[in-house]
Every structure is written in C-alpha cells, then in structure tokens.
C-alpha cells in the first residue's frame, strides 16, 4: 500500500524515531500513515512492540482492519475492547503480540492492575500511537497515561516508547486570542512529549486533491409563530415556582442556564434537608428538559419524556411527600390538554427545514448516504421516530438507524458496543443510508461514500465542528447546519469558524518556533504539569483522610434515612463502590429483572436495580462478582453525614474518607450467604 507524497512528508521524523503529532484533515489518511510508521518500526527496532490507543470502541475494529492490511500478516496483531467478554489478561496479550489496538481505558486499567496476567508496564512498548490525540488534556485517560510517561521521562527511565499522535483538529482550548491558542497547542505538544507537529508544507496541492471539503450551507429558520404547548408547560412551571416562594429564582424556562440553576437548587436543598424544595427543583428540571426537547424535535416527544418521568414516579415511589402529591396531581390534571396541544400544534420549523434537506439530497443523488448529528440520545431517538413517521419522507428511499453512545446511563436509550459495530457495518455496505448520531460518530468513522452531514441545532466547539464535517467524504458532498435565526447555536457555529482559523494560525506559529526555544517551553510545561498533578494527588489524599470512615453516615438522597457508614464501603476493580455490611440488605429492595447491559465483563455480571426500601429512590444495581452478590451504589444517590455537616459528592473518588479495596476471599469467608449459585 503506497503512501501519497504528503503522507511521506509528515511521517519522515517518525521514521527517524522522533515523537511527532501528525496533523492532517479528516479523510486524508492519518491512520494509513500511522500504520506505515508502525510497520517500519517493527521492521527496524529490536524487540519492537506497538500499542495503538483509540477513544471510541468502534474504532478498535476499524483500525484493526487498516493496520492488518499494512502489516500483511508478518506480525501478530490483536484488538481489545470492553465488549470482548472473557479473555486472556491484557499483560499476557501484550507479551504475546507485536501490535495491540485497544481503548485507552483498557491500557490504563492494565497499568494499575495488581494481577500479573493483567498488568503491563508502559516501557514494554516501543511505540505508542495515540489516535484523536487532541483529547490528551486535563484528566482524560489519554493524559493520565501520558502523565505516567512524563514521570518516567523525568526519572530518566530508558528506553521510553516513541509517541505518535494523530489529529485533524488540535483545537484552541477555549482561547479566543492567538497567544492563548498557541499556549494550548504547546500544552498539547508537551503532554505528548512532541518534537514537532507535522503537516504538509511542500505537498499541499496533492493534499487538497485528496481532502476536498464539503460545501457548507446554513439552513436557518424562524421560531414557532405560535406555541400553545410550550406556553402551557411554562404556565405549569410558573405554578410550581409560586409554591416554591423563591422570587430570586430565574424564570427563563427552556434554557441551559435555567437547568443549571435548578440542579444547584436541588443539591442545596438535599444538603439542607429541605425535601420538598428538592422535589420541586427535580420536577422543574423535568419540565425544562421537556421544553428543550420541544425546541429540538416535536411536542409529542417532549410530552412522552414527561409522561415517562411521571409514570416512573408513580411506579417506584413508595413514600409520597405532600409536594410530590401536589406535583403528580398538577400533571395529571393537565396531561390531556397537553396531549391535545402536542398533536394539534404547529410543526417545529427546524424539522421542516431538515425534511427539505433530506428530500433534496436523497432524491437527487445516486446511492446517497448521510449522517444527522444531534446533541442527546433522547433527541436522536425522537428524530429517528420522526423520520419513520413523516409522510413527506415516505416516497424517498431513506433507511435510517441510530448510532449513539454505549454507556448505560439510561437503559431505554443506550446502544451496546456490538449494536454500534453492526450499524456501522450496515452503513458502510449500504444496507443503511442514514445515521442519526450523537458525538460518538464524530471522530474517526471512515465512510468514503457519505455525501451529506447535517448538524442539527448543535452547540459545540470548533473541534466537534471539524470532526463532524469530516464525515462528509464523497465528491460534491454537503455539510448543512440547521438552526434558528439569532440562536445561540448559530452564534457558536460562526465563532467555531473563526476559531478554526485561529487554530491553524496557532499551529503554524508553533511550527515556526526556534527549536531551542520550543524545547525549553515544552520542558517547562511538562514540569509544571507534573508538579500540578502531584499537588492534586496530595490534595485528594488529604481529602480522603479528612474524616474517620466510621464517623461518616450514608443517607438516602431522597428520604434522608440513615442506611450505613463509610466503613461499610469497599472498591471493586478500583471503581465500583459496594456496601459489604450484611445488615445493609435491610434497607433496599432488588428488582426481579436484572439490569440489561449487553456487554460481557471479565469477573462480574449485573443483577437487579436496587432502590430504597423506605421511599423507592433508585440507588444503583446489584453486582454478581465471582458468584458474590454485592450492592453497587451511585454516589449521587447518597448524602454523606460528616462531623462537619452534610455533603453530596459528585464522584466517589472525591469523598472525604478512604475506601479500601474489596477482598473477595475475606468476604466469602465472612458472608457465605451472599454466594450466588446461579
């Protein structure tokens, strides 16, 4: 597989063993260039071992195909992702193969694992390829791994692996001025220990020939001239505000700012023990969510979300507060009127605009293929339903499916990793010709024949814009931006265009820096980053020692009943927090049906949902770990009563006491009744 001249130009320092970032537009062949570097590395370096890191599960398979084609069967290659189920340990596979392609999370888990079969040292590898390397910042997994690399460098550990970063969009890091953007690019280079960012200087004409950009069009529409459904939702929210008696609370309903405000109110009310105020805030957030859905898709979708919430409240809550009874009655009294307005109100102008785009694109081109990007899984589901029901699109050959995240935050809206791979394959072979996607499909997805990309009412940064645009790779393809005139989304897209230019200027400025000045700057940034990380680690350790575990009580976030102590908690696999006190089972119920996670874990499987026996609040799920049943708790389902007052932690890693690791053998010896014989 021969490389193009611009690919040769950007990889030359990497072939000499230098750490570089390859900066090429989407679709210009970064992966192929990296595969060639890996091949030459395996040919020329004694005992070479390569790891390719990706940040999306579906890219593991895609990159596996590209690297195998390049390596032509001469070296052993394996791919690893979280959905593989039972497998040999990561460390064992690393020792037995020449090249591994895996998600960064798996490598990070292996670096910290105490098990010999699983554990691996970073220095086992002689080359690390970091795909979509612009994610190497702050506390991302990429940056956690590279921080360990920099610590080894500071200790003068030898030999260190070579690092090859790949990106189409380094970004500006939120900077709006050139100096800030340059500092962001330099920080990215420091994080990846980069000798130079490489982009074509002498072969630009050939690059332009092979990476033509789609035609961009702004498809803008007016707001609904009348909105009786939205008006009624706001009227109901006004009534809830009247009960709250908090005149200082903003009433800018249907905005992200309002959402942030009521989230803060619910958290503050929980800490203060104001149960009714917390309930009002939680319900106001659901109404606000409905307004946001209504703005994005249809009124019937917004109503369905509200109905789903109130149905769950009816089914799960076993203790009803006066405020909850009032709120349930308020919705029940007006739900028929809402249903009538939802089905008889005006169409969303953004959907009318989207219909025109799809009719034009899918009627005029041969074998069209497109992707609609939207913000949330909820809106993706709603858009797919609209596509299937819209009369005006029934005469057009549209075969659509979802492509959304594999997370498990909502059983009704997530996709499994296997589902993702199947959908991508069907899209690539033409069985499907339209994807309704969230950001999971923005990066790396290689669909050469995709000729239309629609960004539907999105408020994102310049990296997201560049990545989504890059999915349109066919000749004469179209990139359509759908938004309301004068909206925040439109203003942000225009800012993104300016930031893309700023990013290009910043990279050019870094490339032109004197090498000695550049290297000195990189060293300073690396030292500062390691010092900051060490200080943060020390601060977290101090925080974990703030209170003795036995002096911290666990309270249900909803009914405030005390259900355990910090000393009851243990960590499984370093992340899952379980309560091992046998008496804890007196405080919760377990659903009969297990939680559905279509992903096979190495040592555990999910059991049922666990919820507060007193009030019905969902706390988490039951984990069956090596045949032992353990209740896994969500940190946001618990309040912590400390000697200095109540707190609500956003992450278990931020709680003010130390949680020891789970000891399987000790637990089995002490709690034989927990064993599952299923």
Curated annotation (Swiss-Prot):
Residues 350-514 form the Helicase C-terminal domain. Keywords: Antiviral defense, ATP-binding, Coiled coil, Cytoplasm, Helicase, Host-virus interaction, Hydrolase, Immunity, Innate immunity, Metal-binding, Nucleotide-binding, RNA-binding, Zinc. It is an enzyme of class 3 (hydrolase). The RLR CTR domain is capable of inhibiting dimerization and signaling of RIGI and also facilitates binding of dsRNA. PANTHER family: ATP-DEPENDENT RNA HELICASE DHX58, HELICASE WITH DEATH DOMAIN-RELATED. Belongs to the helicase family. RLR subfamily. This is ATP-dependent RNA helicase DHX58. It comes from Homo sapiens. The lineage of its organism: Eukaryota, Metazoa, Chordata, Craniata, Vertebrata. The gene is DHX58.
């Amino acid at each position: 597989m021969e490389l193009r001249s611009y690919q040769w130009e950007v990889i030359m320092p990497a072939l000499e063993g230098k750490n570089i970032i390859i900066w090429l537009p989407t679709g210009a062949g970064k992966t192929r260039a990296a595969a060639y570097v890996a091949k030459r590395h395996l040919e020329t370096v004694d005992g070479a071992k390569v790891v390719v890191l990706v940040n999306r599960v579906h890219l593991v398979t895609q990159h596996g195909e590209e690297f195998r084609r390049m390596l032509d069967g001469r070296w052993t290659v394996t791919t690893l992702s979280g959905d593989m189920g039972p497998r040999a340990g990561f460390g064992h596979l690393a020792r037995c193969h020449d090249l591994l392609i895996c998600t960064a999370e798996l490598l990070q888990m292996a670096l910290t694992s105490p098990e010999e079969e699983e554990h691996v040292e970073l220095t086992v590898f002689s080359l690390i390829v970091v795909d979509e390397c612009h994610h190497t910042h702050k506390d991302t997994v990429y940056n956690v791994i590279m921080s360990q690399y920099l610590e080894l460098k500071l200790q003068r550990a030898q030999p260190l692996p070579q690092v090859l970063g790949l990106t189409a969009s380094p970004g500006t890091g939120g900077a709006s001025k050139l100096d800030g953007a340059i500092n962001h690019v330099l920080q990215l280079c420091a994080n990846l220990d980069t000798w130079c960012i490489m982009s074509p200087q002498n072969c630009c004409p050939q690059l332009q020939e092979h990476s033509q950009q789609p035609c961009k069009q702004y498809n803008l529409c007016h707001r609904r001239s009348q909105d009786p459904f939205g008006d009624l939702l706001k009227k109901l929210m006004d009534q809830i505000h009247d009960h709250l008696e908090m005149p200082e609370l903003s009433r800018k309903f249907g905005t992200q700012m309002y959402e942030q405000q009521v989230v803060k109110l619910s958290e503050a009310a929980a800490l203060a023990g104001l149960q009714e105020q917390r309930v009002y805030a939680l319900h106001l957030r659901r109404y606000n969510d409905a307004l946001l859905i209504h703005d994005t898709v249809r009124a019937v979708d917004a109503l369905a979300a509200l109905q789903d919430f109130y149905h769950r409240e009816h089914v799960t809550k076993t203790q009803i507060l006066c405020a909850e009874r009032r709120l349930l009655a308020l919705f029940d009294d007006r739900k028929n009127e809402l249903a009538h307005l939802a089905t008889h109100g005006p169409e969303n102008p953004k959907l009318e605009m989207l219909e025109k785009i799809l009719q034009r694109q899918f009627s005029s081109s041969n074998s069209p293929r497109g992707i609609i990007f939207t913000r949330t899984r909820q809106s993706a589901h709603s858009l797919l339903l609209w596509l299937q029901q819209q009369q005006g699109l029934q005469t057009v050959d549209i075969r659509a499916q979802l492509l959304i995240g594999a997370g498990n935050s909502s059983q009704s809206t997530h996709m499994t990793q296997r589902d993702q791979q199947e959908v991508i394959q069907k899209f690539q072979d033409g069985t499907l010709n339209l994807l309704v996607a969230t950001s999971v499909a923005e990066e790396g997805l290689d669909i050469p024949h995709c000729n239309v990309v629609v960004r539907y009412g999105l408020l994102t940064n310049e990296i997201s814009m560049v990545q989504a645009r890059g999915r349109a790779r066919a000749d004469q393809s179209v990139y359509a931006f759908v938004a309301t005139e004068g909206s925040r989304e439109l203003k942000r897209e225009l800012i993104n265009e300016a930031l893309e230019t700023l990013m290009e200027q910043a990279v050019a400025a870094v490339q032109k820096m004197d090498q000695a000045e550049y290297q000195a700057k990189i060293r300073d940034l690396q030292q500062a980053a390691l010092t900051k990380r060490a200080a943060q680690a020390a601060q977290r350790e101090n925080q974990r020692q703030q209170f003795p575990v036995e002096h911290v009580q666990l309270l249900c976030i909803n009914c405030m009943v005390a259900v355990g102590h910090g000393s009851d908690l243990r960590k499984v696999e370093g992340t899952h927090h379980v309560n091992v006190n046998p008496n804890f089972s007196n405080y919760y119920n377990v659903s009969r049906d297990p939680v559905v996670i279509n992903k096979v874990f190495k040592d555990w499987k999910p059991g049922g949902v666990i919820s507060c026996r007193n009030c019905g609040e969902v706390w988490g799920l039951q984990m069956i770990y090596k045949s032992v049943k353990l209740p896994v708790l969500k940190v946001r389902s618990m309040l912590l009563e400390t000697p200095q007052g109540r707190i609500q932690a956003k992450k278990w890693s931020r709680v003010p006491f130390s949680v020891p690791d789970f000891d399987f053998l000790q637990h089995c010896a002490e709690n034989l009744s927990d064993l599952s014989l299923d």
